[in-house]
Structures are given as C-alpha cells and as structure tokens.
Amino acid sequence: MTNFIYNKHIISINDLSKKEMNSIIDFSFSFKLKSFNTFLKNKIIAICFLEASTRTRLSFESAIYRSGGTCIGFSDSSNTSLEKKGESFIDTISIISKYVDAIIVRHPKEGAARLASEYSNNIPVINAGDGANQHPTQTILDLFSIKETQGKLDNLNIAIIGDLKYSRTVHSLSQAISKFKKNKIYFIAHSALMLPSYIINILEEKKVEYSFHDSIEEVIKKIDILYITRIQKERLDSSEYANINAKFILKKSDLFYAKKNLKILHPLPRSNELSFEVDKTSYAYYFQQAENGLFVRQAILSSILNKKL
C-alpha cells in the first residue's frame, strides 16, 4: 500500500489532498476488521490536551495501545509547567518533541496546532482541535462514516444543522466535502450562527452547490446525511442561547419523510439538540461514528509513523 502521509503534520483538513484522505479512509477499514496490530510497536506518542475531551482523547489512547504503542502526556495543563511555572507553549512543545515520535495537540486557541508544528523539531503534529478552527481527524472519521453508510463520497445531499459559526467540525467537514464531486450541502442554522464567510468563499471557489435554510423540514426528503452539532452555550448569553436552541432540536417526528438511506451523524457531545428518541431509529449512526474514530486514528498514526505499510 502506498503511504502518502508518512512523517506529515495533520493540522488542517486542507493539508490533505483528496487522494490522501481516500487513502486514510481505505486503510481505516482494515483496522475495523482487525483492530489489534503492531504498527506502532516501539513508538511513543504524546497526547497534549489543553482543552476538555472525552472521545478524541480516549480514542487516540486506545488507538495507540491497540496498535502496540505507548502514550504519555496530559489531559489538561493544571499540573504542567505551562500552568504552574509560566513556561511558554512553544518551549513545552519543543521539549516534548525530544521524548516522542508524534505529538497530538488540542488547544482552545485557533492556530495553536500550527504553531506547535513549527516548534516540534520535525516530529509530526496532529491537530485534535484548535478553538473554532479545525478538527481534521474528526473530519476524516466523519467521511469514513459517510462512505461506510452510503458507499461513496460523491453525489450526496448533505444537511449540516446547528452551530455553523463556531463549530470546528462543521468548518473542517465543509472544506473536506468540497474536495469531492457533485455534493450538495444544505446549511440549517439561526442567523446568529451562520457559516463564516471564508468557508463560503471556499465553497464558491470549488463550485460546490449549497443553500441556507431555516428548518430541517425544508430538506428532509432530499438528504442522505444529516450532520447535527450542538449549539455552543458558552459562546452565547443565556437568553440568546435559549431562544436559538429551542428552534433546532431534532425529534423523531422530524424524520417522518426521511429517505431510507438517511444516516444522522453528530460529533458529540450532544446537549438537547438531538432527542434521545432518535437513538432508536434506523437513521441514528452517531455512536457507530464515534467508534469509527478509533479505527481512523489508528490508520492516521500508523501512516505518519511508518514509511512502509
């Protein structure tokens, strides 16, 4: 198998070509068939999270151990020299790079992962989320889940609903979809949480067909994928949040006219934007999607740390 991403930083989904994304996705299927392997034998990977995480951190850790590797690091900065002694972020990354074969970074500030890659002494850096900017490994597992359920990544009708303004998963996924052919994206959000202009510019440049809508009812008969994200309460005042959130809650009744092949994806965690009653429908795929994060992250780590696969 040709390895396109050996020793490569993965900071933005735009760092990966369509060919590279497809390569990772195809490789991920092999890990779903056989999760335990030795691709990361004798490899040490640093997990440096300065922002809360459950699925991303634990799936990365599981991916490392299942592939024979070892991980070190921290899940917050409270007991590090960053917090206690005022050490700079770039010094922290520079030192950590001396101990490991790869560094996985999550940070609340946009651009932090890119900065880490500039001070990692040629040790590959993976962005596990930087502010409202990018979350490339989540996007690849989203694409994997779409291909797994639809059998393709082209010629699809995809609705994205919720927080389009601040959600890094939405920003990454929208850019990734633009690399594939003849997809149409239906964006559904409150006007206060609309897609950033730079994402719209990318879609325009790539000639992606897209439209904006006020409710899921407008598009439910057309779509193959419904990607829903939580409204980020921490970004809004309480009254604004309550008003917006109440309008974007997906219920089982909203799916009455859905196509049989529709699958609902969610990067999780959810708040109340996705009713628990939806979990029992044939459309729900977000828990399988979360599981797929394990296999995709095994494929990514194995690829960047092995010249030959």
Swiss-Prot record:
**Residues the entry annotates as binding L-aspartate:** 85, 168, 230
For this chain, one GO molecular function annotation is: aspartate carbamoyltransferase activity
State the EC number(s). 2.1.3.2
Q: Which reaction does it catalyse?
A: carbamoyl phosphate + L-aspartate = N-carbamoyl-L-aspartate + phosphate + H(+)
Q: Which InterPro entries match?
A: Asp/Orn_carbamoyltranf_P-bd (IPR006132), Asp/Orn_carbamoylTrfase (IPR006130), Asp/Orn_carbamoylTrfase_sf (IPR036901), Asp_carbamoyltransf (IPR002082), Asp_carbamoyltransf_Asp/Orn-bd (IPR006131)
Pathway field of the UniProt record reads: Pyrimidine metabolism; UMP biosynthesis via de novo pathway; (S)-dihydroorotate from bicarbonate: step 2/3
Keywords, sorted A to Z: Pyrimidine biosynthesis, Transferase
Q: Where does carbamoyl phosphate bind?
A: 55-56, 106, 135, 138, 268-269
The UniProt entry, under Pfam families, shows: OTCace (PF00185), OTCace_N (PF02729)
Q: Which GO terms describe its cellular component?
A: cytosol
Presence of keyword Transferase: yes
List GO BP terms, alphabetically: 'de novo' pyrimidine nucleobase biosynthetic process; 'de novo' UMP biosynthetic process; amino acid metabolic process
Q: What class of enzyme is it?
A: transferase
Q: Which Gene3D superfamilies match?
A: Aspartate/ornithine carbamoyltransferase
Cite the NCBIfam families for this sequence.
Answer: asp_carb_tr, PRK00856.1
How does the record describe its quaternary structure? Heterododecamer (2C3:3R2) of six catalytic PyrB chains organized as two trimers (C3), and six regulatory PyrI chains organized as three dimers (R2).
Protein's job: Catalyzes the condensation of carbamoyl phosphate and aspartate to form carbamoyl aspartate and inorganic phosphate, the committed step in the de novo pyrimidine nucleotide biosynthesis pathway.
Instruction: Identify its protein family.
Output: Belongs to the aspartate/ornithine carbamoyltransferase superfamily. ATCase family.
What is this protein's record name? Aspartate carbamoyltransferase catalytic subunit
* The species this protein was found in: Wigglesworthia glossinidia brevipalpis
Higher taxonomy:
Bacteria, Pseudomonadati, Pseudomonadota, Gammaproteobacteria, Enterobacterales
